[in-house]
Amino acid sequence: MNSAISDTLTFECETGNYHTFCPISCVAWLYQKIEDSFFLVVGTKTCGYFLQNALGVMIFAEPRYAMAELEEGDISAQLNDYQELKNICLQIKKDRNPSVIVWIGTCTTEIIKMDLEGMAPRLEAEIGIPIVVARANGLDYAFTQGEDTVLAAMAQRCPEISVASKQNQPMGSAFSQTLKVSNQQDHPPLVLFGSLPSTVASQLDLELKRQSIEVSGWLPSQRYTDLPLLGEGVHVCGVNPFLSRTATTLMRRRKCKLISAPFPIGPDGTRAWIEKICSVFGIQPQGLEERENQIWDGLKDYIDLVRGKSVFFMGDNLLEVSLARFLIRCGMVVYEIGIPYMDKRYQAAELALLQKTCQDMNVPMPRIVEKPDNYNQVQRMRELQPDLAITGMAHANPLEARGISTKWSVEFTFAQIHGFTNARDILELVTRPLRRNHSLQGLGWSSLVKEQNQLIPS
């Protein structure tokens, strides 16, 4: 990270523990994004209960994920793990015939040292379906890092651009179409990584196309069979701040060139993201300032609500720095940015933009607390009395009972917040508790908790 940033940004690390949503929840959006995939979570009943509650399973929907439930025989090594997983995968092949099966490791597989990585290649050769192994245990990873481990594993399976270009692919194949596009470009191939809804990904593609930049592919792609070509000369750029492991894999293993840019969250972040990609390719960006100003003009009704209000990030989904930067630009005061894990190299451009935003808005730099201690945070909130706390679900009700308005951080993970046009959705989420409080005050209800009754001695 740049020394200029570290001189002004204050980083602290408290407990060293993660207080976040479980990372296996990445299955919720990844199985929908990769349409020909099947996700198999290898864990205990607790993992199954969590998935059922977090993902809202419908009985007749037959979603493309399942639980391989570990029993006493598995844990005590009385059963053959390989044979058990083989039976399950054969059943998946018979029922669904996916293009890829993704094994998701959990806390239990980590504790009992289950060798999923060792079993997968053998079983893959036997059943004829690619098996990708990703560890998403809550011991080592925070909430959204589950996606990071899956994409890092999938990056290893992407075809090599130099090998594919030498082969004579038929014109109808995905590989040849990608190569055809890249040959027409006036810039090196660009691959974007990060799982976004198709509509949002299309919006970002269109914004880059307006600057004469063609996107060669996405990781993950909508189909496993359409994974992008990777290799030397391919530029990659992330859209989410929690994908540091994927970025490292793309650089070290696949020899790609990483474009270190702020993340396209909010109009300011989206503009900076596009400008950085343009600068790497030597392209002069056109009309971005007007585009950004147009979006800000459309957000005035929300900005009037949040201007001057204070917010406290407890830390959960690793989107905290980007969201804080956007809210500071909207006129809010950020007291503290709690974050479970901070890769200062991968987020260097985002941190630089945060610093610049604070200087432009003439507000003090917020503290950035990595792996925050929740008890200490509650004490700090009691002193600061922020207008809003963005927190994990576990702390929302207790904080509300103490008179602090809250917003679940998990909602920002599942909402569409990337790009120019989705900035309104971020402010819609942020202002909802503030608008609710205003409505309650209009009704004369200033407290959501009854005062404690006084006992009269008999």
Curated annotation (Swiss-Prot):
GO terms for cellular component: chloroplast. Pathway: Porphyrin-containing compound metabolism; chlorophyll biosynthesis (light-independent). It is found in: Plastid, Chloroplast. The keyword Transcription does not apply. Its EC number is 1.3.7.7. The keyword ATP-binding applies. Keywords: 4Fe-4S, ATP-binding, Chlorophyll biosynthesis, Chloroplast, Iron, Iron-sulfur, Metal-binding, Nucleotide-binding, Oxidoreductase, Photosynthesis, Plastid. Binds 1 [4Fe-4S] cluster per heterodimer. The cluster is bound at the heterodimer interface by residues from both subunits. Protochlorophyllide reductase is composed of three subunits; ChlL, ChlN and ChlB. Forms a heterotetramer of two ChlB and two ChlN subunits. This is Light-independent protochlorophyllide reductase subunit N. It comes from Chaetosphaeridium globosum.
